[in-house]
């Protein structure tokens, strides 16, 4: 415990809360260019080939972002929009690519939960 004299000398510092998506620099989304598009395997009880991309953001960061949905058209030099949001079973993946914007097309034949995948309402 601090003495009153110590508290007069220098006050208590508030605890700074760290952001979960530092590469976005406080913005809701950031634009970036894919440098590598590949698949990776998830952590222990799960098994799959998850689609991810290495993205160089306009903020200067190089991050790993998850590509949601079934099938995608992304390749090297594709321009994408990145939002926050981690993938629990992929260590180090703290960002999602926004489908239906810039070079990332929406998910084909998706009928339900379309908003997250950039799909217009079917006629």
UniProtKB/Swiss-Prot annotation:
Cellular component, GO, one term: chloroplast
Source organism superkingdom: Eukaryota
Keywords: Chloroplast, Plastid, Ribonucleoprotein, Ribosomal protein, RNA-binding, rRNA-binding
Record flagged with keyword Lipid metabolism: no
Any one GO molecular-function label of the UniProt entry: structural constituent of ribosome
GO annotation (BP), single: translation
Keyword flag Transferase: no
Signal peptide: none
PROSITE patterns: RIBOSOMAL_S12
Pfam families: Ribosom_S12_S23
Localization: Plastid, Chloroplast
Protein family per UniProt: Belongs to the universal ribosomal protein uS12 family.
Subunit structure: Part of the 30S ribosomal subunit.
Function: With S4 and S5 plays an important role in translational accuracy. Located at the interface of the 30S and 50S subunits.
NCBIfam families: rpsL_bact
Protein name as catalogued: Small ribosomal subunit protein uS12cz/uS12cy
């Amino acid at each position: 415990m601090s003495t009153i004299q110590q508290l007069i000398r220098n006050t208590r510092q508030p605890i700074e809360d760290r952001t979960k998506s530092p590469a976005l620099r406080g913005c809701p989304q950031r634009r970036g260019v894919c440098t590598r598009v590949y698949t990776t395997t998830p952590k222990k009880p799960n098994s799959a080939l998850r689609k991810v991309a290495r993205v160089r953001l306009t903020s200067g960061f190089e991050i790993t972002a998850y590509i949601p949905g079934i099938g995608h058209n992304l390749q090297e030099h594709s321009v994408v929009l990145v939002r926050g949001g981690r993938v629990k079973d992929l260590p180090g993946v703290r960002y999602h690519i926004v489908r239906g914007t810039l070079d990332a097309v929406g998910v084909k034949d998706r009928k339900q939960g379309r908003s997250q995948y950039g799909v217009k309402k079917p006629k």
